Curated annotation (Swiss-Prot):
The lineage of its organism: Bacteria, Pseudomonadati, Chlorobiota, Chlorobiia, Chlorobiales. This is Glycogen synthase. It is an enzyme of class 2 (transferase). Synthesizes alpha-1,4-glucan chains using ADP-glucose. It comes from Pelodictyon phaeoclathratiforme (strain DSM 5477 / BU-1). ADP-alpha-D-glucose binds at residue 20.
Amino acid sequence: MSRRNFKVLYVSGEVSPFVRISPLADFMASFPQAIEEEGFEARIMMPKYGTINDRKFRLHDVLRLSDIEVDLKEKVDLLNVKVTALPSSKIQTYFLYNEKYFKRNGLFTDIHNGSDLKGSTDKVVFFNVGVLETLQRLGWKPDIIHCHDWHAALIPLLLKTVYASHEFFRDIKTVFTIHNIYRQGILPMKAFQKLLPEEVSSALHCSNDEVNMLYTGVEHADLLTTTSKVYAEEIVHDGLQTYGLGRVLEEHQAKFYGILNGIDSRQWNSAADKLIKKRYSLEHMDGKLDNKKALLEEAGLPYTEGTPVVGVILNFDEFQGAELLQQSLEQLAALDIQLIISGSGDKKYEKVFQDFALEHPEQVSVHGEYSDSFFHLAIAGLDILLMPGMIESCGMIQMFAMNYGTIPVAYAGGGIVETIEERDEESGSGFIFHDYSAESLVGKLEEALACFHDEESWQQIVMTAMTRDFTWKKSAEEYDQLYRELLEP
């Protein structure tokens, strides 16, 4: 079978621009396109959340994919499917919908308040079983189902148990990618026992009457990946990074690979971006100042010539660095900067940041609601992107930023050290702090600010950043090889 005949289904809880909760959505927006360019046929399945605007994204019903029965042991629920093309591509994206499960804002985390939703078990089981039932009704058989994070972790086990005897699913391989090891999907075993046959529920990884979905995906997938080589090493060998999964990852190390993320340079191109105030390039950088002014206006902050604008774009939780950011606020406010904090999540952090902005109305702004337009404008308008997250499997935002001449200041770890060339006297594309503390973060930011005020040095670092190659080409070729090896008889 030639490579061009291979079919890959990507299953995820989020895909940008339809919904973005974490960097996984950015991955899903661009990686399937890169794989298609390698000669595969790619399709996507995700939940149809209540926040997804059918008209905006041109979703339409598929009559032959209506009223699909999803057997949840003690009940049968119906599934309907809508479809559209992933923007700027021909990749069919299927949205699985049932009002009872998906009408609320989020499937696993409420986008607006950040709290875990009650009853996530029935939602995740419905979604995972629904994916397989939809494939059967659709009659499109993938060679590989590539599952992302715990939201899709049940599919490899389902294929090896209740669906193993189905002719349609014979020989389908599974790949499971870990984007967020600290989000593992810990759910009550009793709920799974009510929804799944005994042969499935008994094979789930259970401890203290709780199921670990991420662990289950690791155990049963045919191939495991994560989003950088350094991160793969860290989560196998570094006890601080594994969050209880070190042993199972070490057991399956032979099938575990780290492949660095890339970005879609067509979507993230400052010279062609339709979502920013004014397009610009390395040869014509004047437009970046226009974007800076537009960003400040959007954020409700005054423009002051020569004052750097520093931005933080993150989920408000401890893993993404909200706690460290909170610890750093007073020191940041003492610097001659303007600070824009964009994100949502834990209400505790939201209140802290909003209160701090009220105390510093001319210097600090908090932007809560995610939108593609603000995200792109921020990447284009910021001078410096501050990344306080302790754990960064790879991240893509620092690559977006460097493409746009926005310089990252980030904590060392995972894909950060693979994507940011640390600044020294001669070269570099960003700044990295190695001690996870407020003092280290602020100290490294001060280094970046000193560079900013040295025009020649700043031009050099911006040029280095904007000429880095972050395209998916190399990573897609690595996945191409892994996929083909997995499918060899």
